[in-house]
Amino acid sequence: MAREFSLEKTRNIGIMAHVDAGKTTTTERILYYTGKIHKIGETHEGASQMDWMEQEQERGITITSAATTAQWNNHRVNIIDTPGHVDFTIEVQRSLRVLDGAVTVLDSQSGVEPQTETVWRQATEYGVPRIVFANKMDKIGADFLYSVSTLHDRLQANAHPIQLPIGSEDDFRGIIDLIKMKAEIYTNDLGTDILEEDIPAEYLDQAQEYREKLIEAVAETDEELMMKYLEGEEITNEELKAGIRKATINVEFFPVLCGSAFKNKGVQLMLDAVIDYLPSPLDIPAIKGINPDTDAEETRPASDEEPFAALAFKIMTDPFVGRLTFFRVYSGVLQSGSYVLNTSKGKRERIGRILQMHANSRQEIDTVYSGDIAAAVGLKDTTTGDSLTDEKSKIILESINVPEPVIQLMVEPKSKADQDKMGIALQKLAEEDPTFRVETNVETGETVISGMGELHLDVLVDRMRREFKVEANVGAPQVSYRETFRASTQARGFFKRQSGGKGQFGDVWIEFTPNEEGKGFEFENAIVGGVVPREFIPAVEKGLVESMANGVLAGYPMVDVKAKLYDGSYHDVDSSETAFKIAASLSLKEAAKSAQPAILEPMMLVTITVPEENLGDVMGHVTARRGRVDGMEAHGNSQIVRAYVPLAEMFGYATVLRSASQGRGTFMMVFDHYEDVPKSVQEEIIKKNKGED
C-alpha cells in the first residue's frame, strides 16, 4: 500500500499537562473533530475514549499513554495522550522521546502547576517544540493572562498569546485571532458553527497591544523580521506565521492559545496551530545512534529510502492480541511478516502483525513508513527503549532514561494458587513498566515491589487483581533508601581457602571513589602486567555489583560509586572466578570502614496550596518533617508553598493537611533527588534493619 500522507503532512504530537487540567477531554475533542469518534465521552462520567483501562475510567485519570492516529486538514496527526499524575512520569518521558512536538494544556484558573513544571522540564531536556492551550476558560476564576504570566514566572518560557479570549467563565463565547485580527464567535454547543467577525470594539485596544507584543517577540528570534520591524515596515500575516513556526520548531518561542475543551470552544483552532506551528518529521534533526559493529556515530534522516530504524517506546498486554510493542519509525519502511534486528539485545525478531491504534481499538496495516507510530504483535525479546533496525544496517538509538523507584511495599499471595499466578503477573507488569521493579528479599523470601509513588503501586496491585485474577496481601509502603560512599579509599580483598585438593585464591586492591549523582556504579580495570589475569576481571566487577545490591550499612542498594581495580595477585592452580568474586566483595566490606558510607533518602518537591490563614501551619508542617521551604507565592486568597521534604516524612500528610485547613488545602509531590539522611536518622534506620529496638 502506498504512503497515504507525505512526511511534510505528518505530525507526531503529545498532549501533556498537570493532572485535572482537562488533557484527556482535550484529546477526546480532537478525536471528535477529526472524525474518529461520533459521541463525546466525558472523563468525569468515566466514559473517555483514550482512558481505556478500568482503573483509569474509575479514577478519572490517564495512566498509560494511548497512541491514536487522526486526520486534520489533509494531515495525519499521531497523538499520544500522556498522564498528568507524577507517579506515571516514565509514561511522559517515553512519549516525549518519540514525539516531534507537544501541546501543553493548562487549567486557566491555576496556570502552571507542579506537574506542568515536571513535564515542561522533561520536554526541554528532549528538545520538544510546544504550543500551549489554556483550557477551562469557562471555569469560575479562569484568567488567561494570569496563565500566560505563570509560563514566564515559573518556567521562564518565552511564551506569548496568539489568541485572546472574548469573555471568561460563563460569558466565554469566542476567541480573537491575533494574526488575522478577527474574532471567532461560537454559536452552538458543539463548537461546529463558528462566525468570523470583526473584533468587538471593547476588545480592539487590547488586541492591538498584544499583536504588537507578539510581533516584537517573534522578530527577536529572526534577524530579517527584526530589521523590518525596526524600520517600521509592515510584517505580513504570512511572514508572522512563518516566523512563529520557525521559532517554535527551534524551541525559542511558545505560542499560547485559549479555549474550553469541555464546552467545545477553541479545539479546532488549536488543531490548526498543531499543523501550522509544530514540526513534521522533516523539520527535526536526523536521529543519531551508534553502529554496534564500529562504535561510530551514525544518523538516520526521516526518509522511506533510508534503512529501517525504529525505537520501541512502550510494551502493553492487550486482552485480545497479547503483547503489543509500540514503536516510532524514524527511517525506512517496515512490512508485516518481515524480520528486524533488535540491536539493543542483539536478537532477531519477526514482525507478526502491525496495528495502528485508536485508544483501544485497532486497525491492521501491512506497511508502516518513516515518521509513523504503530504497534507490532509477536516481538518476544523487545522491551522499552530497544532499537529495531534493518539487519544489514545496524544502529543503536539513544534509549529512554528510567528514573529510580522511590517507594516499595511487600506483597504476598493469599493462596498457593495465587502464588504461581503472582510471579507471572508481576513479570508481565514489569515488562510494561520499567519504573516498576520486582525483587525477592534474599533473607526472608518476601516479594518486594517498587515504584514511583503510592498511586503507581496501587494501580499495579489493582491490575494484578483484575487482569490476572491474583489476590494478594499488601504491606505498608516503605521508602526506597540507597547507600553510597562519601570519601575515597583503597581496600584489599583477600580470599584464600585450602581444604584438601584444589583450593581457592583471589587477591584484589580496589580504589573506591564517590561518583556524580545519578551516574550509578562505574568499574574501571587499571591492571597492568597481568597481576590479575584478564579472565578474572569480569568476576571482580560481578562480585562488586552483587555485594552492592545489599549495601554495607543497612542492606540498601549502593549507587554512585566508582571502583578502580589497580592491583592484586593470583595462584596458577587455585584462582577461580568464584574466588575473585568473593575477594571483590571483601574489598567492598573493608572499604566501608574508611569511605564514610551514607544512607540516601528520596527528597520530594512538595507544592502545598492553602488559604492565607493556614500559612503558619504549613510552615510548621514543613519544618517538623525535616523539610526546607524553597519559595512562596500568593495566588488570590491562597498561598502556594514549595518545599523539599523527605518522602519518609510525607506518609499520612494528606490527613494532617486536610484537618489543619478544614479540607481546603491541597498538595502535590514529585520526586526530585536523593540526599544524605541526618546521622541520627541513619542510626535509627540501621537499628531497624538489624532488628534492634
Curated annotation (Swiss-Prot):
Compartment(s) where it occurs, according to its Swiss-Prot or TrEMBL record: Cytoplasm
GO cellular-component term (any): cytoplasm
UniProt: GTP binding residues: 17-24, 81-85, 135-138
Keyword presence, Lipoprotein: no
A single GO molecular function term of this UniProt record: translation elongation factor activity
Keyword Nucleotide-binding: yes
Alphabetized Gene3D superfamilies for the sequence: 3.30.230.10, 3.30.70.240, Elongation Factor G (Translational Gtpase), domain 3, P-loop containing nucleotide triphosphate hydrolases, Translation factors
Keywords (A to Z) from UniProt: Cytoplasm, Elongation factor, GTP-binding, Nucleotide-binding, Protein biosynthesis
SUPFAM superfamilies the record matches: EF-G C-terminal domain-like, P-loop containing nucleoside triphosphate hydrolases, Ribosomal protein S5 domain 2-like, Translation proteins
Organism domain of life: Bacteria
Primary site of residence: cytoplasm
PROSITE patterns cross-referenced by the UniProt entry: G_TR_1 (PS00301), G_TR_2 (PS51722)
Residue span, tr-type G domain: 8-282
Swiss-Prot/TrEMBL GO biological process terms: ribosome disassembly
NCBIfam families named among the record's database cross-references: EF-G, PRK12740.1-3, PRK12740.1-5, small_GTP
Family: Belongs to the TRAFAC class translation factor GTPase superfamily. Classic translation factor GTPase family. EF-G/EF-2 subfamily.
Protein purpose: Catalyzes the GTP-dependent ribosomal translocation step during translation elongation. During this step, the ribosome changes from the pre-translocational (PRE) to the post-translocational (POST) state as the newly formed A-site-bound peptidyl-tRNA and P-site-bound deacylated tRNA move to the P and E sites, respectively. Catalyzes the coordinated movement of the two tRNA molecules, the mRNA and conformational changes in the ribosome.
Protein known as: Elongation factor G
Organism: Streptococcus pneumoniae (strain CGSP14)
